[in-house]
Design a protein with these regions (language model features):
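Surface-exposed binding patches on compact interaction domains or structured appendages
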Residues: 1-3
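Aromatic-lined carbohydrate-binding surfaces of glycoside hydrolases
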Residues: 6, 16-24, 30-183
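Surface-exposed loops/turns
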Residues: 9-13
Length: 183
C-alpha cells in the first residue's frame, strides 16, 4: 500500500498520529493507526532539485489501463495524475518514441511511434510530429522539461515502418547498415 501525505511547509516538526481508513469493493472498511514524523527541514521547490530523475513513461499503458482512445483528450486527462506524480518526484526527462516497438518485445505494452512517417505517391517523405509535439508539450506543462530522450533511431530488426500512400497500406523497409535503403 502506498500512502502519500502532503506536509505543509509551515508544519511544526514532530510526530503526528491518526487513523487511516482503508476501503475496498466487497470488503468492510478498516481503520489502521498511522504515525508520521515531520522533520525540521523544508525541501526546496522540485524545480530547484539537482538530482536527475529519469523514469521511462509509457503513455500507451495508460491508454490501455484507462480504456481511452490513444492520444485523445480523455487519454491526456488520464495521464495527468500519473505524470504529475513523476513531476512532483523530480522527473526531468520526457520519454519519446520515434519508431514502433523501440525495445522490441521487452515491454508488456508496446510503445508506438510518436512520429508518423508517410511515403508519398511521388516518392518523397512526410514526417508528421503532431503526436510527438503534443506529448512533449503536455509533459513540459507539468514541469518535466529538462530533457527529451528519443528512442530509437535504429530499430532492433532494421525494419523501418511507414504508411505507403501508393498502396494505402502500412509498410516497412527491411535493410542493413550501408545499403542504399539505409542511406
Amino acid at each position: 500500500v502506498w500512502v502519500t501525505v502532503s506536509v505543509p511547509e509551515d508544519a511544526k516538526p514532530g510526530k503526528y498520529s491518526g487513523k487511516l481508513t482503508v476501503t475496498a469493493a466487497n470488503a468492510k472498511a478498516r481503520s489502521l493507526p498511522i504515525e508520521i514524523r515531520v522533520a525540521d527541514h523544508v525541501l526546496p521547490p522540485v524545480r530547484d532539485w539537482t538530482f536527475h530523475l529519469d523514469l521511462w513513461q509509457n503513455p500507451y499503458a495508460v491508454a490501455r489501463l484507462e480504456s481511452v482512445p490513444l492520444w485523445s483528450e480523455e487519454h491526456f486527462e488520464a495521464m495527468r495524475p500519473v505524470m504529475s506524480l513523476l513531476a512532483d518526484a523530480g522527473q526531468k526527462s520526457v520519454t519519446a518514441t520515434l519508431i514502433n516497438r523501440p525495445w522490441n518485445g521487452q515491454t508488456y505494452d508496446a510503445f508506438g511511434s510518436m512520429v508518423t512517417k508517410v511515403r508519398r505517391i511521388d516518392g518523397t517523405w512526410l514526417f508528421d510530429y503532431t503526436i510527438f509535439d503534443r506529448w512533449v508539450e503536455f509533459m513540459f506543462s507539468l514541469g518535466i522539461d529538462r530533457q527529451i530522450n528519443c528512442y530509437s533511431m535504429i530499430p532492433w530488426a532494421m525494419e523501418f515502418d511507414f504508411y505507403n500512400q501508393a498502396t494505402g497500406l502500412n509498410d516497412c523497409v527491411r535493410t542493413v547498415a550501408g545499403s542504399p535503403e539505409y542511406e
